[in-house]
From Swiss-Prot:
Domain Globin residues, every copy: 1-141
Keyword terms, alphabetized: Heme, Iron, Metal-binding, Oxygen transport, Transport
Protein name: Hemoglobin subunit alpha-A
Subunit structure: Heterotetramer of two alpha chains and two beta chains.
Residues the entry annotates as binding heme b: H87
Protein's job: Involved in oxygen transport from the lung to the various peripheral tissues.
Organism (species): Drymarchon melanurus erebennus (Texas indigo snake)
Keyword Ribonucleoprotein set for record: no
A GO CC term attached to the entry: haptoglobin-hemoglobin complex
Residues binding O2, per UniProt: H58
Length: 141
């Protein structure tokens, strides 16, 4: 459960991410595909080289979707409902990939922070991204 402090920290940390969605998204996906090559399975039709237009476009979609969740922290499930359905029913993405994506996103945010993230910010982001992952896999049952 996100506390009011968590929500405030998530919103603050997310500002630069949402303003640079393509950059953060592409970099996060590059990290994901590098660290966890099995996740490439769903993107066989993409050019997965760093900086490719495919990574930029899809990365922006990912960040924009998570931004929608940030904008609806009191109803993350509602904000991600259609996306959850899509990934569970049509795309059939392995649910573990959402946790991996969240981890790579946290690393990307930290890398662009200009210094270490405060522990309480890391905790709040982690709680939020775990909630996002949990929400996205909720339709798998």
């Amino acid at each position: 459960v996100l506390t009011e402090e968590d929500k405030s920290r998530v919103r603050a940390a997310w500002g630069p991410v949402s303003k640079n969605a393509e950059l953060y998204g592409a970099e996060t996906l590059t990290r994901l595909f590098t660290a966890y090559p099995a996740t490439k399975t769903y993107f066989h039709h993409f050019d997965l080289s760093p900086g490719s237009s495919n990574l930029k476009t899809h990365g922006k979609k990912v960040i924009d979707a998570i931004t929608e969740a940030v904008n609806n922290l009191d109803d993350v499930a509602g904000a991600l409902s259609k996306l959850s359905d899509l990934h569970a029913q049509k795309l059939r993405v392995d649910p573990v990939n959402f946790k991996l994506l969240g981890h790579c996103l946290e690393v990307t945010i930290a890398a662009h922070n200009g210094g270490p993230l405060k522990p309480e910010v890391i905790l709040s982001l982690d709680k939020f991204l775990c909630l996002v992952a949990k929400t996205l896999v909720s339709r798998y049952r």
